[in-house]
Swiss-Prot record:
Listed Polar residues bias regions: 380-390
PROSITE patterns the record matches: GATA_ZN_FINGER_1 (PS00344), GATA_ZN_FINGER_2 (PS50114)
Record keyword Metal-binding present: yes
InterPro entries with a match to the protein in the record: GATA_ZnFinger_Domain, Znf_GATA, Znf_NHR/GATA
Name of the coding gene: gtaL
Biological process according to GO: regulation of DNA-templated transcription
Name recorded for this polypeptide: GATA zinc finger domain-containing protein 12
Native source species: Dictyostelium discoideum (Social amoeba)
Length: 640
């Protein structure tokens, strides 16, 4: 539940300012408050504000607290609050001892105004003034000044405080404290205890507004001066007050107040001499208006909560209803804080907007970096001293300065020193020197010298289409360890030697050119393709009738007459291994004896070869003299 407030007009504000009916000390007013079932919200703040200033130690039996407010014109509210039940027992439960006023600061913001304070660390006790407001006060000045030379009231040191009451009527009320009677015609206030003289000087009244309660401990209190601004733009507007000083620096406890109608009020501190200006609110922006209302209500609720807490502390007979009022005020404060927070969160950018802002920042940074790189690439290299040319600074971890070699400075080289690094400048100078000396400068950075045999194939084919493609790829690529390795691999691939080929000769036909080498009786890759096929077919075609006969046919390889002629011619010119000579000898012996060649028939099963008699093995060994072939090898060869 939230109270509805309205903005007072200029006339209403002036009426409230001149209305002194809210200040009273009559006991009948307390009876009226107790008799009322409902009172407007905000009536307790005036009572607590004037509690310390009007606390009369001599008049304790009459109630002690004589400043409860019965007017509802200060804080307008549509939500009435019940009167605390503790006030009914107020007259009977006040202690009979003289009490000093509470030493805490008391706020007297009794106007429906929005205050934005900025606190200063002033360790000056506040003073609660007694309100001397008359209907005939003429305000002519727009500043409030507190000076030591304008002391218009002499405050005696007494042990009992005095209460100054102001009446709008011309009637004179004689009380126990000799109250001042303010007449509308003369504007003269007479106080026997305080001896305050109010001088009427051209309708400019010097009104003492600080009457301190002086006790034996000399405790003093002061109230902050509330600055008000009236606006004539709308009939109902809030009064924005930007109060920059919470406590006014006062000397000798005297303040002379000069005010003027329809003017802005400024506070001037007597010691600091600070002028405070005020800012008009912008009523066209609803968000700012909402923030203003939230701040005003929050300050008002906090002030009321402070006053209610002081009242409950000073009243020993506080009922449970008053404590509930404190909790209710706390709930109002929490509600205003949450509404203020929600209105502030609305002004913050969303997550999507934040992401867009981040993307824009990243894009702008990238564009800036690209622009800088482009400018660096376009700038020509400058001349460098000669001693830098002779330095042995490597261009990369893989390169080094080699004599008779040159490097070309590429704009895409990424180093730690930028475009004008010592490495790049050294390379540019080397190019110039080498060009003057007639040395060919290669387009690839290589640690090898130019005149070396490794780089010559690449230099010869430099103008070929394939080399141009390689150049483009190298320009587009960045310098890195992989880039250098690729160039070295390209050079190595072009200068790579072929593997050494072993010269083989067929044991049977003595040929060295064959698509495939096959296994023979002497081992693997000893026969050419044709001889190996014939040898395998001969082993598979074994006649059944010759299974028990000596296997002389296994060693015979059918050869053509040309191969035989080649064998005879080669035997006369070249020396052949002992293994080849033995085979040729056996073939020649067979030809001389005119032994008919026997083609064996296929064996029914290869497993029958395992049952070959020992005589077959002996006959096979006799045919191939000077050859020691193991039995296991022969058996495995027969299965193929």
């Amino acid at each position: 539940m939230q109270d509805s407030y309205y903005l007072m007009s200029k006339n209403q504000f002036q009426d409230l300012y001149n209305d002194n009916s809210i200040y009273f000390n009559d006991e009948s007013n307390i009876e009226n408050i107790i008799s009322c079932e409902n009172v407007p919200f905000g009536s307790t703040i005036e009572a607590s504000n004037n509690f310390d200033s009007n606390y009369n130690c001599n008049n304790i039996n009459n109630g002690g607290i004589n400043s409860f407010n019965n007017s509802s014109s200060i804080f307008k509210s549509m939500t009435p609050k019940k009167t605390p039940n503790g006030l009914k027992n107020l007259n009977n439960n006040i202690p009979t001892v003289n009490l000093a006023p509470i030493s805490e600061n008391v706020s007297t913001d009794t106007l429906n105004s929005q205050i934005v304070p900025s606190f200063q660390s002033n360790n000056i006790p506040q003073q609660i003034p007694s309100s001397n407001n008359n209907n005939n006060i003429n305000n002519n000045n727009n500043t409030i000044s507190s000076n030591n030379n304008n002391n218009t009231a002499s405050i005696p040191i007494t042990t009992t405080p005095t209460v100054v009451n102001n009446n709008n009527n011309n009637n004179n009320n004689n009380n126990n404290n000799n109250n001042n009677n303010n007449n509308n015609n003369n504007n003269n206030n007479n106080n026997n205890n305080n001896n305050n003289n109010n001088n009427n000087n051209n309708n400019n009244n010097n009104i003492p507004i600080s009457n301190s309660c002086n006790f034996s401990n000399n405790l003093e209190k002061s109230t902050p001066i509330v600055n008000l601004i009236q606006y004539e733009q709308q009939p109902q507007q809030n009064n924005n007050i930007y109060q920059n000083n919470d406590t006014s620096n006062l000397n000798n406890n005297n303040i002379v107040c000069h005010t003027k109608d329809n003017e802005n009020i400024e506070t001037i501190s007597s010691n600091n001499n600070n002028n405070y200006t005020y800012q008009d609110p912008n009523y066209q922006d609803p968000e700012k208006v909402q923030l203003t209302m939230n701040c005003f209500k929050l300050i008002q609720y906090c002030s009321q909560l402070t006053n209610l807490t002081k009242q409950a502390f000073s009243n020993p007979s506080a009922a449970a209803c008053e404590l509930e009022t404190l909790s209710t005020m706390g709930n109002y404060i929490q509600y205003e804080i949450s509404s203020l927070k929600s209105s502030l969160v609305k002004n913050l950018p969303n997550e999507a907007q934040q992401q867009q802002i981040r993307l824009q920042q990243q894009q702008s940074q990238q564009q800036h970096q690209q622009h800088q790189q482009h400018q660096q690439h376009q700038q020509p290299p400058t001349n460098i001293p000669q001693h830098i040319n002779n330095c042995n600074i490597p261009r990369s971890p893989f390169d080094s300065c080699v004599p008779n070699s040159s490097y070309i400075n590429s704009p895409l080289v990424a180093n730690d020193f930028g475009y004008y690094s010592p490495n790049s400048m050294m390379n540019n100078n080397n190019d110039k020197i080498n060009s003057e000396q007639g040395v060919f400068s290669s387009t690839i950075s290589s640690p090898l010298p130019i005149n070396s045999s490794y780089t010559s194939p690449y230099i010869k084919n430099q103008n070929s289409p394939q080399s141009k493609v390689v150049k483009k790829q190298l320009k587009n690529s960045k310098q890195s360890p992989t880039y250098i390795n690729l160039t070295e691999n390209m050079i190595r691939a072009q200068t790579k030697k072929q593997k050494k080929t072993i010269s083989r000769v067929c044991v049977n036909c003595k040929t060295s050119d064959t698509p495939e080498w096959r296994r023979g009786p002497q081992g693997a890759k000893t026969l050419c393709n044709a001889c190996g096929i014939r040898y395998r077919l001969q082993q598979q075609q074994v006649p059944q009738s010759n299974l028990n006969s000596p296997r002389e046919s296994y060693a015979v390889i059918p050869t053509c007459d040309e191969n035989i002629k080649q064998q005879t011619s080669q035997n006369s010119t070249t020396n052949i291994n002992s293994s080849t000579t033995t085979t040729t000898a056996t073939i020649q012996q067979q030809q001389q004896q005119n032994i008919p060649q026997q083609f064996p028939q296929p064996i029914q099963s290869p497993l029958k070869m395992l049952n070959i008699d020992q005589q077959i093995l002996n006959s096979y060994e006799n045919n191939f003299k000077n050859q020691f072939i193991e039995k296991d090898f022969l058996l495995m060869d027969s299965f193929e």
